[in-house]
């Protein structure tokens, strides 16, 4: 089943995308998506409606429209398009208003925009991103006392994207350190990491998956051979066990899932909002 899907917002459209995708993922739908942020005026809304209506005329199938818009005028224009329109935030606001006994006070861009109340947390996330970049792949072992978690693992097991996701999404200062082929003859925990053992967390991966990932980077190399990958993974997992370092097999998990599992296992709190 194929459908055109619109994510529309008067802000970044991140909320519409996340909630809309979460709902749509429950159905066997192949989606052609259109993300339209900052639909703040009637003129812009009319343009969006024309696009929705054009697709309906061409296909004969109503596009699915997930939107989050504060302006009643803009919202009404979207609702009168030829799409199947779902106001994803209002569907939750109405029952919550009844429970709380107070009226909502919507403010444009409050969710993902900068406000006085969230500026400090935004700055913390930027600082966490800077930290992750400065401490990626063992570039620097200085200031590890400032890290909240230090990820360890073989090359290409997911350390860098996980570190950056932890920083961007949760404001977590994450460093990461790679174990490379040259380390394998006498693999030990580096002395610089030992004082921070309580912050260490290992990532591992199935050798077959690791070989496939490395093959894309260095085709037909020793680095990408299944034999090399099996050896490295085995040695590093043994190191984790010897040093009682908690670790996770990342093979079947997305970066989002890996990050969330790390926070859960380590008992770390999120800083999203």
UniProtKB/Swiss-Prot annotation:
Enzyme class label: transferase
GO biological process terms held by the UniProt record: regulation of DNA-templated transcription
Reactions catalysed according to its record: [pyruvate, water dikinase] + ADP = [pyruvate, water dikinase]-phosphate + AMP + H(+); [pyruvate, water dikinase]-phosphate + phosphate + H(+) = [pyruvate, water dikinase] + diphosphate
Disulfide bonds: none
Source organism, top-level taxon: Bacteria
E.C. number(s) listed in UniProt: 2.7.11.33, 2.7.4.28
Positions of transmembrane segments: none
Residues engaged in binding ADP: 153-160
Alphabetical UniProt keywords: Kinase, Nucleotide-binding, Serine/threonine-protein kinase, Transferase
A single GO molecular function term of this UniProt record: phosphotransferase activity, phosphate group as acceptor
One Pfam family of this chain: Kinase-PPPase
Protein family according to the UniProt entry: Belongs to the pyruvate, phosphate/water dikinase regulatory protein family. PSRP subfamily.
Record function comment: Bifunctional serine/threonine kinase and phosphorylase involved in the regulation of the phosphoenolpyruvate synthase (PEPS) by catalyzing its phosphorylation/dephosphorylation.
Protein name (database record): Putative phosphoenolpyruvate synthase regulatory protein
């Amino acid at each position: 089943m194929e459908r055109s899907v619109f994510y529309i917002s008067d802000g970044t459209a991140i909320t519409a995308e996340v909630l809309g995708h979460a709902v749509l993922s429950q159905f066997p739908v192949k989606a052609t998506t259109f993300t339209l942020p900052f639909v703040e005026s009637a003129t812009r809304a009319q343009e969006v409606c024309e696009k929705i209506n054009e697709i309906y005329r061409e296909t004969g199938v109503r596009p699915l429209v997930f939107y989050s818009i504060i302006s009643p005028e803009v919202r009404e224009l979207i609702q009168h398009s030829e799409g199947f329109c779902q106001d994803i935030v209002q569907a939750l606001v109405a029952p919550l208003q009844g429970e709380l006994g107070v009226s909502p006070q919507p403010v444009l861009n409050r969710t993902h925009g900068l406000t006085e109340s969230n500026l400090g947390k935004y700055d913390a996330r930027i600082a966490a991103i800077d930290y992750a970049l400065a401490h990626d792949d063992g570039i620097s072992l200085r200031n590890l006392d400032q890290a909240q978690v230090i990820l360890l693992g073989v090359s290409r097991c997911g350390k860098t994207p996980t570190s950056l996701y932890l920083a961007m999404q949760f404001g977590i200062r994450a460093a990461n350190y790679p174990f490379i082929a040259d380390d394998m003859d006498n693999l030990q925990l580096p002395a610089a990491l030992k004082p921070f053992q309580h912050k260490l967390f290992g990532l591992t991966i199935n050798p077959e998956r690791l070989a496939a990932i490395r093959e894309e980077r260095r085709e037909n190399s020793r680095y990408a051979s299944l034999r090399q990958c099996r050896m490295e993974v085995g040695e590093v997992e043994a190191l984790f066990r010897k040093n009682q370092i908690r670790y996770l097999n990342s093979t079947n998990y997305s970066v989002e899932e890996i990050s969330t599992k790390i926070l859960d296992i380590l008992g770390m709190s999120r800083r999203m909002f």
